[in-house]
Amino acid sequence: MLAPGLLGALSSGAQALQPPTGVVVLTVGGRVRNTNDGRRAQFDMPMLEGLPQHSTVTRTPGFAQARRFTGPLLRDVLAAAGAQGTLLRLVALNDYQVDMPYDDAQRHDVIVARLLDDKPMAVRDKGPLFVIYPFDARPELRSAVYYSRSAWQLRTIEVL
């Protein structure tokens, strides 16, 4: 369920995503139906905070100790954008790109983390958004394939 006011109905059956009022931190483009910028869905931090929040405590290759990551599930972000596809291209602030099967967002509780140990993440700390799989909860995810899909400094998701 989306936060009240996040979406407004359009006569075409698509949904209009409310426009961001703050700095855009995430753009979802490609095969999306719910837009607020022509053909893209743009999110500011309050919009992401308005989605249901989830946490996972897990280790990653970048952190030796288990850390707590909190944010909306990737599948909820995609649902807010009305995304439908087979592949997600994740693009970071430094232009790092990695492809993730769309199904990963549905099968795993992948989080678009906005908090690290309950604090907002600065760019120098891999923020402001970090795609995190529940590595410690699902041992089969502890592999180079899934680690490479955990893009930090996420800025764009292209739905293909």
Give the residues covered by each predicted segment:
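N-terminal export leaders
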Residues: 1-2, 6
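N-terminal signal peptide c-region/cleavage motif recognized by signal peptidases
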Residues: 9-11
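N-terminal intrinsically disordered, low-complexity segments enriched in P/E/S/T
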Residues: 13-160
